[in-house]
Swiss-Prot record:
EC number: 3.4.21.53
Protein's UniProt keywords contain Cytoplasm: yes
Protein name, entry field: Lon protease
Compartment(s) of residence: Cytoplasm
Native source species: Helicobacter pylori (strain ATCC 700392 / 26695)
Highest classification ranks of the organism: Bacteria, Pseudomonadati, Campylobacterota, Epsilonproteobacteria, Campylobacterales
Gene: lon
Catalytic activity: Hydrolysis of proteins in presence of ATP
UniProt xrefs under HAMAP family: lon_bact
Segments of skewed composition (Basic and acidic residues): 585-609
Length: 835
């Protein structure tokens, strides 16, 4: 064939794949140029050249490859859609020598030259062909690319290039890969490249076969499960057991319709949507249990259920007085709060068309532990006959605990607020947010920010719980918060609450509480009668003063409970009457006879006189060790010691502030675990005392004058505060102390030591001192004065502003037994303190 080439042939472009020699293949033509080229070849009995179209084109590049196949048109036929189908017979590979050009007839023609293969070593090529055939047979075992007739054709053929063309055509290679094999005239390299391609294709086919097998197995398993489930459903229908699910769905729809008037539109739609989803979900689906749990939880929320008890402030006052002794100011504020609510209800009934926009305030009871903050909330709930829900916020650091967990999480549930409504079964319970000052922030959010919405009357009408996914009205809930230290509550949250101080009890108040509440309650708990235990007045006073150290009565209750347990033990030891064992026999008594005999025996035992009297003399038998709440004051007046008054989380305390002077250069040393504020107070006090000494407001003893070298006395007198170093100490050094209220006490003790003047031991003081010598007000006055009263202090010096503002809050018992003196400046303090 080479003798007639190169020659110019009509050019056809095949879109999809390369054609190979000795291959008869159908080709579909659509454009006019190709159809004209075929007509020309048929009329002139000419060969044609078919090249494969490129997928990607570069600039100034022909849209087809420069190699293709030379062949003849065996047959052609016109198709209904205007296309032409022809049967092409490939004869030889060819290469385009020059770019194709369009001729006068309107089709492309190009100068074509056949591709000649390089010479090769037949033995070497034969070995490579055998390896290639082996790899092809391996591929044929895992795929359908090589049918048996093609394998036979490969085995019967001896031409290595013909074998390579047959394999390449069967592999359906990508165009660039096929071009690389097609255009290569190195027979050995072609065969080696084909071996690599066949090996990679074998791996791919094996992987696809494994994947298909797994998918098929999974589909079979799925179909099997579906078939079994359908069978199970039919069996359940026959047995009637599937009716329960339908009944549950009907109950959900009925319950939803019954509460529809009380639901917001978004809430109704959300719950209904989930019920509809449940009805479409298979009972064995994992979503079914999640949906059912959500629906039942939301339908348990008491929408439209409210406590109908009309408010009665008289009943509220009676309940508070019944449950709590003293606490006059907190009780008054609570009664005022409910008086406002009662008046609003009365006015609404008279003018129902008028909607009052007044929002209730949030009460927060704050004070030391055990003074009755939570029990006040309990009394409120009893008085207005509403359920009480207590939410402990201490240590809470996950905002989802309040707002609820989103339903995307496993084990999700509504927040504590919604859970509280479900627990109360009313939409207007009394909800106690206990220990609100101990809420913490963490990476899981800031619960205090969620409380802003909950406690804001302007926002809590549409509180959105993440689990519910709709807003819930909390405006009818009475929120009451409790705290020990309001300084730890964030400022925005403090702004939403009204604070009511529940401060420490006096010893007399504790005694009355013990008599009227604690002792009767503990007697009942320990199954003892009032006639069986007598605790004397002196003994009760001793327990309060020596065995407890607290602002409230929680520890006092524990001490009384300890006494009751020991009395109960003593009762059983003194009455060793036990029920005897009986043997079954003919003369065994009936159950009624046994019951009568037991009653008779119990009466005999009860009639026996038993009474334990607890006195100061035998108290040690019932209680272990004393605590010594506040040490009594020293009766002796001393230099360099002053009684200061302090506030602690368990109430007030009397702090002895001591100071020593040591020969030195006028330095001040501070010990006793003092905080930064207290250290600054000491520095201020030292400066104020120096000024008083310089002004000769304070008289100092004479200091030996310095002499010169000749023994003559100098006229210059050394200042006393420059001659000594002061060491100020506050005992109980292991206990951290801070605050500005010890300012006047520190100044007094420094003046005492520098002037060599004793202080009055029966005087105690509290107040912040400024550099100008003024006394500023302080906090915790009630607790401090109660501590002074307990310690036997006779005179307490307090800032004048506290005297004018807070004196009414001081218990009458303390005011009557304590001389409370208001002071404006340090001069008045020193006048009352120094002898």
């Amino acid at each position: 064939m080479t003798e007639d080439f190169p020659k110019i042939l009509p050019l056809l472009v095949e879109e999809d794949t390369f054609l190979y020699p000795f291959m008869i293949a159908p080709i579909f033509l659509q454009n006019n140029a190709s159809i004209k080229a075929v007509a020309y070849a048929k009329n002139n009995k000419s060969l044609v050249f078919i090249a494969c179209q490129k997928d990607k084109l570069n600039d100034n590049e022909a849209p087809y490859y420069d190699v293709g196949v030379i062949g003849s048109v065996m047959r052609e036929a016109n198709m209904p859609n205007g296309r032409v189908k022809l049967l092409f017979n490939g004869i030889a590979k060819g290469r385009i020598l020059e770019p194709a050009k369009e001729n006068e007839q309107g089709f492309l023609e190009a100068q074509i030259s056949p591709i000649e293969y390089l010479e090769y070593d037949k033995e070497n090529i034969q070995a490579i062909v055998e390896v290639l055939k082996e790899k092809v047979i391996t591929l044929a075992n895992v795929s359908s690319l090589f049918p048996p007739d093609l394998i036979k054709a490969l085995e019967d053929n001896d031409d290595p290039n013909r074998i390579a063309d047959l394999i390449a055509a069967a592999l359906h290679l990508k165009k660039d890969q096929a071009y690389s094999l097609f255009a290569n005239n190195n027979t050995e390299q072609r065969l080696l490249d084909l071996i690599d391609i066949v090996i990679e294709e074998t791996k791919t086919q094996k992987l696809q076969k494994e994947i298909k097998s797994k998918v098929h197995q999974k589909m079979e398993q799925t179909n099997k499960e579906y078939f079994l489930k359908e069978q199970l459903k039919q069996i359940q229908k026959e047995l009637g057991t599937d009716k329960q699910r339908d009944e549950d769905l009907n109950q959900y729809y009925q319950k939803l319709e019954s509460i529809k008037p009380f639901l917001k539109e978004e809430a109704f739609k959300e719950i209904k949507k989930q019920i509809d989803r449940l009805s479409r979900t298979h009972a064995d689906s994992s979503d079914s249990a999640t949906l059912q749990n959500y629906i039942e939880t939301m339908l348990d929320v008491p929408f439209g259920q409210y406590g109908k008890k009309a408010l009665d402030i008289k009943h509220v006052r009676e309940q508070l007085d019944k449950d709590h002794y003293s606490l006059k100011r907190p009780k008054e504020r609570i009664v005022e709060y409910f008086a406002t609510m009662q008046l609003l209800e009365m006015r609404r009934k008279k003018k129902p068309e008028k909607k009052d926009k007044t929002k209730g305030t949030i009460l927060c009871f704050y004070g030391p532990p055990g003074v009755g903050k939570t029990s006040l909330a309990n009394s409120i709930a009893k008085a207005i006959e509403r359920p009480l829900v207590r939410i402990a916020l201490g240590g809470l650091e996950d905002v989802n605990e309040l707002r609820g967990h989103r339903r995307t999480y496993i084990g999700s549930m509504p927040g504590r607020i919604v859970q509280g409504l479900i627990e109360a079964k009313k939409m207007n319970p009394v909800m106690v947010l206990d220990e609100i000052d101990k809420v913490d922030r963490s990476v899981r959010g800031d619960p205090a920010s969620a409380l802003l919405e909950i406690l804001d009357p302007e926002q809590n009408t549409a509180f959105r719980d993440h689990y519910a996914n709709f807003s819930i009205d909390l405006s009818q809930v009475i929120f009451i918060a409790t705290a020990n230290n309001i300084d730890r509550i964030p400022a925005p949250l403090r702004d939403r609450m009204e604070f009511i101080s529940v401060s420490s009890y006096t010893p007399n108040e504790k005694e009355e509480i013990a008599k009227n509440y604690l002792i009767p309650q503990e007697l009942e708990k320990h199954a003892l009668k009032p006639s069986e235990v007598e605790i004397s007045h002196e003994c009760l006073k001793l327990i309060i003063e020596k065995y407890t150290r607290e602002a409230g009565v929680r520890d006092l209750r524990r001490q009384i409970a300890t006494i009751m347990r020991k009395v109960a033990l003593k009762y059983l030891e003194d009455n060793p009457h036990q029920k005897g064992r009986t043997k079954k026999g003919k003369n065994e008594k009936s159950e009624d006879q046994k019951s009568e005999d037991q009653k008779s025996e119990n009466q005999k035992s009860e009639n026996k006189d038993f009474c334990v009297s607890i006195t100061p003399n035998n108290l040690k038998e019932y209680l272990e060790r004393m605590v010594f709440e506040i040490d009594p004051i020293d009766e002796e007046n001393k230099i360099g010691i002053v009684n200061g008054l302090a506030w602690t989380p368990v109430g007030g305390d009397v702090l002895k502030i001591e100071v020593l002077k040591i020969r030195g250069k006028g330095e001040l040393k501070l010990t006793g675990s003092l905080g930064d504020v207290m250290k600054e107070s000491a520095i201020i006090a030292f400066s104020v005392v120096k000024v008083l000494l310089d002004n000769e407001t304070l008289k100092v003893p004479k200091i030996p004058s310095e002499t010169d070298a000749e023994g003559k006395k100098k006229k210059k007198v050394l200042k006393v505060y420059n001659a000594y170093d002061l060491h100020l100490h506050v005992p109980e050094g292991a206990t951290p102390k801070d605050g500005p209220s010890a300012g006047i006490a520190m100044a007094s003790v420094m003046a005492s030591i520098l002037c060599d003047r004793a202080t009055r031991s029966e005087v105690a003081m509290t107040g912040e001192l400024t550099l100008s010598g003024e006394v500023l007000p302080i906090g915790g006055l009630k607790e401090k004065l109660i501590a002074a009263f307990k310690a036997g202090i006779k005179t307490a010096l307090i800032p004048v502003k506290n005297y004018e503002r807070d004196l009414d809050e001081i218990p009458a018992e303390v005011r009557e037994n304590l001389n409370i003196v208001a002071v404006k400046n340090i001069a008045e303090v020193l006048e009352k303190t120094l002898l």
